[in-house]
Amino acid sequence: ATVTESDIHCIRAKGKLSNLREKLAGGENLAQVGIGHTRWATHGKPEEYNAHPHMDMAMRVAVVQNGIVENYRELREELKVRGHEFRSDTDTEVIPHLIAEFLALPSSSSPLSPSPFLE
């Protein structure tokens, strides 16, 4: 995922970095900042839709991580109740959705306010 002034542009590929390199070949990218990650599949099939980075629904938050979200099933269900839609089967995808929830809080809300997501 790369970042320009107003957008996050995300290109993912299944498998080796050479697969991603082929997808990027010949394209123009003016971004000066980006993130990427290769990871062994721990949740979900090793398919492109499960590849990192993962984004929120508005495509404003991109996340890569190399860990396991132990309570991702519970968080995913809570987020679905709140209207979130998921594009992957991975545990990581809950993270950008949680960040989006936090960013949507009114500015007067305290980050320490009780939240069903603080577990």
Where are the language model's segments positioned?
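Conserved short alpha-helical segments that host acidic/polar catalytic motifs at enzyme active sites
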Residues: 1-119
